[in-house]
């Protein structure tokens, strides 16, 4: 199970007290949410957000088993954290502003290891990479399969270079183009093998412990889930919902 890091430190930075309303913008397995619920007490509320329905279900089950007394203090919301302003306004907490907002950015190990998400080159699965309930996204949204099989060489090269900082992006794209001529690239392992065969670990001084597909997969995950745009919108909207002396951590 994923272990929440810097738990006490993060909660401390928010400077919360009993009765406060606080947002955990990245619920995950609920580690931070539990700590926040403990701090704000019976009269406080924690608005816990996650766009992954699986994460919400698992966090609820964990809290029911381990901290049932906190359930009434937590409001679970399935949504993108970029919509934090609308979420806070629509939860009936009587609070237009909140005392604190906490965001623990990154992927849970459970998501990375789950084939349904198609996130990892260590687990063979369909190229997906959607964070939203392993593919519960609008029908017209692109997943990693769409990008790898339909984007132009120039667009792929730019994606890998800019979002993955992959210095072998041109070589990798040439290999992808050649593979696409034979058949669609459908799985994570197919793509990882194409990348590894095209560049291996050559020239990666100081990077020998990472798989050669790491940076490409990073770029795809960021693109598929609009991570940079979502983060920018979230930061802007988080400031809107904070009290005058509220904190974002």
Question: Which stretches of residues belong to each language-model region?
Answer:
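S-adenosyl-L-methionine-dependent methyltransferase catalytic core, i.e., the SAM/SAH-binding region
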Residues: 1-249
């Amino acid at each position: 199970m994923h272990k929440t890091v810097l738990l006490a430190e993060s909660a401390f930075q928010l400077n919360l007290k009993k009765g406060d309303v606080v947002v955990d913008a990245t619920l995950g397995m609920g580690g931070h949410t539990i700590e926040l619920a403990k701090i704000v007490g019976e009269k406080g509320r924690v608005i816990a957000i996650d766009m992954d329905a699986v994460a919400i279900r698992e966090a609820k089950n964990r809290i029911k088993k381990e901290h049932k007394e906190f359930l009434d203090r937590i409001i679970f919301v399935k949504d993108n954290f970029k919509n934090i302003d609308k979420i806070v306004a629509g939860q009936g907490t009587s609070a237009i502003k909140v005392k604190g907002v906490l965001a623990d950015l990154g992927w849970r190990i459970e998501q990375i290891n789950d084939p349904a998400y198609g996130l990892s080159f260590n687990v063979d699965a369909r190229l997906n990479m959607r964070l939203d309930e392993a593919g519960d996204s609008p029908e017209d949204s692109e997943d990693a399969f769409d990008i790898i099989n339909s984007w132009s060489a120039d667009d792929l090269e730019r994606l890998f270079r800019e979002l993955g900082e992959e210095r072998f992006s041109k070589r990798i794209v040439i290999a992808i183009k050649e593979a696409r001529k034979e058949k669609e690239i459908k799985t994570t392992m197919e793509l990882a093998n194409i990348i590894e065969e095209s560049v291996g670990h050559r020239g990666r001084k100081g990077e020998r412990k990472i798989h050669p597909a790491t940076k490409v997969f990073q770029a795809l995950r960021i693109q598929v889930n609009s991570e940079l745009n979502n983060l920018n919108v979230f930061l802007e909207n988080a400031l809107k919902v904070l009290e005058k002396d509220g904190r974002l951590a």
